[in-house]
Amino acid sequence: MKNNEIDTIAAISTPIGRGGIGIIRVSGKLVPEVAMKLFNKIPKPRTAEYLTCIDHNGSIMEKVITLFFPEPHSFTGENILEIHGHGGQMILDLLLDRILNISSRIRLANPGEFTERAFLNEKIDLIQAESIADIINATSYQAAKSACNSLQGHFSNQIRIILNKITNFRTYIESTLDFSDQEISDISYQHIYNTLQNIIDNTNQICKLTHSGVLLRDGIKVVIAGKPNAGKSSLFNSLINKDRAIISNISGTTRDILHEYIQLNGIAFHIIDTAGFKKNSTNEIELIGMQKSKYELSKADHILWVIDSTDYSHNNSYNNIINSLKKELSSNNIEAVFITIIRNKSDLSFEHNGIDTTNKYACITLSALLNHGIDLLKKHLYDSAMLQIHKNSNFSSVEENQGNFIARKRHLKILQKVFQYLLSAKTQLQYNMTVNDCFAEDLKKAHEELAQIFGKLTPDDLLEEIFRAFCIGK
C-alpha cells in the first residue's frame, strides 16, 4: 500500500442530508485509540453496542450504536469501527470532526478508499470491487441482482478457471520449449491442440456472457431515428412517460440528442431521441445534428426507425423504408442490431395498431401522440432485449436468472483481446505443426491481459479512475 494509505481514514458513509440513521466509518491502525477517546472503551468485536459518545471535554455528544471489526477479519482487512447515530447532518459533521482531531494520522477518506483498501489487502478482487459500485449505481432490478452475483464471485470464478488453465498450459509449453531441438510427437501435438481449443472455447463462451453482463449494467441502448417530423420526439415522450422532448409540427425541432432511462420488467433501457435525417440539407446545425444521430445509431443495441404512416402505403413501402435506413447505417451495423420499423401517426392514416413480424424486421403501427400501441412496443422492446441477453446466457426471463453476472466494457475489451491472442496462438500451431517462441509469446500476452481483469498488472491510473468513481465513505 502507498505511504499515505497507512493513515487511519474516516468518512460519513450515508448520503448527505437528514435521515433516520447516519453512519460514520473508520478504518486503520488507530481505530482502538479512536474508540477509547470517544467511548472510554473498545467495543466488543462483531457485536452491536449502545454507547455514549463524548467530546474532548468529556461532555456527551450523542448516543450511538457501534460495530467493531478487528483486523484482519473486516471488509478492508484493517481495524474497522462503524458508528451508527442519528441522521442529522450537523451531528454527523460534529462526530466526524471529533474523530479527525484525535490524531494527525487520521484523515478524511478519499472517494472509494475503503473499497480500495479491501482490494489492496486482497479481501476482494477488482471485479468484486467494481461490482460494489455497480450495486450502488444499478438502474434496474436485474442490474442490481447481477451485480450482487458478481460481488459473490460468480464472474471472478469463471475468469479464474480460464486463467488457471492458461497458467498450467504455459507451464507445459515452457517445458516443451526446453527441448525445442526435438519435434513433438503426434500425441503431444494433439494434446496441445485440444488443450488450446478448450481454452479458446471457454474464453469465447465467457465473452458472450460478459457481453450480456455489459447489457445488464449499461442498459439496452434504444435509438429512435428517422426523417424529420415523423413523430420521433412524440414516441420518445410516450416511452419515457413524460414531456421531455419539444413537440412541434415544424420539421427539424430536435437538433440535439436526448437521453432517458426506463425500466421494463427489471431490465434497464437507455432511450435516445435523435435529430431527423433531412435530405440535401445545407444547414450547419442540422448537419451537426445528423452526424450525432449517425454516431448514436452506430452504438445502438436496438433501432426504432420511425416513419410517418401517411407518407408510405402499407403494402409497398417496406423495401423503400429499409433502403432509407441502410443509407444512414454502416453495412456491418445493420446486421448486428435489432431493428424495428415504427409506422407512426396511425390516428391520421386510419390504420389498425399492431405488430407485423412477417418480414425480416418487425413493424409496429401505433400513434405516439395518442399513446396508442405504446404498451405493445414496450413488450416488444423487452422481448427483444431478452433475446439479446438469452442468446449469450442460459436464462430466458428475469426470474430464471440466478447466476448471471454484471460486467463492464473494460472486462469485455480485455476478454476480446485474450480471445484474439489465443486464436493467433492456434494459427501459429497449425502453421508450424509445433510450438515455438511466437506461440509461447501469444500465450504470455493472453495470460497477462486476462490478469488485468483482477487488477494484477493493471496501471495505477486505471485503478485510481475505478476507485475515485465511488462515493466518499465506500
From Swiss-Prot:
Protein's UniProt keywords contain Zinc: no
Listed Pfam families: MMR_HSR1 (PF01926), MnmE_helical (PF12631), TrmE_N (PF10396)
SUPFAM superfamilies: P-loop containing nucleoside triphosphate hydrolases
Gene3D superfamilies tied to this protein: P-loop containing nucleotide triphosphate hydrolases, Probable tRNA modification gtpase trme, domain 1, tRNA modification GTPase MnmE domain 2
GO cellular component: cytosol
Residues annotated to bind Mg(2+): 233, 254
Enzyme class per UniProt: hydrolase
UniProt keyword list: Cytoplasm, GTP-binding, Hydrolase, Magnesium, Metal-binding, Nucleotide-binding, Potassium, tRNA processing
Domain TrmE-type G: 219-386
Single GO molecular function: GTPase activity
Compartments (UniProt record): Cytoplasm
Binding site for K(+): 229, 248, 250, 253
Cofactor(s) of this protein: K(+)
EC number: 3.6.-.-
Cofactor binding: number and manner: Binds 1 potassium ion per subunit.
GO process terms (BP): tRNA methylation; tRNA wobble uridine modification
PROSITE patterns: G_TRME
Entry-linked HAMAP family: GTPase_MnmE
Subunit structure: Homodimer. Heterotetramer of two MnmE and two MnmG subunits.
Stored PANTHER family: TRNA MODIFICATION GTPASE GTPBP3 (PTHR42714), TRNA MODIFICATION GTPASE GTPBP3, MITOCHONDRIAL (PTHR42714:SF2)
Functional summary from the UniProt entry: Exhibits a very high intrinsic GTPase hydrolysis rate. Involved in the addition of a carboxymethylaminomethyl (cmnm) group at the wobble position (U34) of certain tRNAs, forming tRNA-cmnm(5)s(2)U34.
Similarity-based family: Belongs to the TRAFAC class TrmE-Era-EngA-EngB-Septin-like GTPase superfamily. TrmE GTPase family.
Protein name: tRNA modification GTPase MnmE
Source organism: Blochmanniella floridana
Name of the encoding gene: mnmE
